[in-house]
Amino acid sequence: MTDFCSIDGRLTPLGEGLPGGVYLYQRLRTVDYRPLHTAAHLSRLRDGAGSLFGRPAELPAGRIADEIGALLRANGYPAGGATVTLRLYADGTYALTADGVSLYRTYALRSLRPAAAVVPCDGYRPEWPTSARREMAR
């Protein structure tokens, strides 16, 4: 399956490459194909572009949100949590790349893990000593 990126709103095979040059970026979390806190992310990019590139960027939040949804669907991402990187280049070009599916639907502490599936099984050699048997014998 081809991975896609979005450059200035156009879906493009990722293999064709992203624009080169200096850029600012924000990584956005998404839930069900919609980015979270889009306005805050775009505000940071606008401020950074004004400071570093000498001109603020015009990135409409609604259009960016729609493009993120289209990008995730084009890449075959399931509904749920995912991460997307928005790059803003010095010339005003922007690019979106899908970075991966998340186990979590929203923000979560990285030290938290989903509940593990536990499958009971016997050891290869039941007569061999194990730490569990030693503890049970005490």
Where are these regions (language model features)?
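Helix-start/capping segments and mature chain N-termini
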Residues: 1-74, 81-83, 89-138
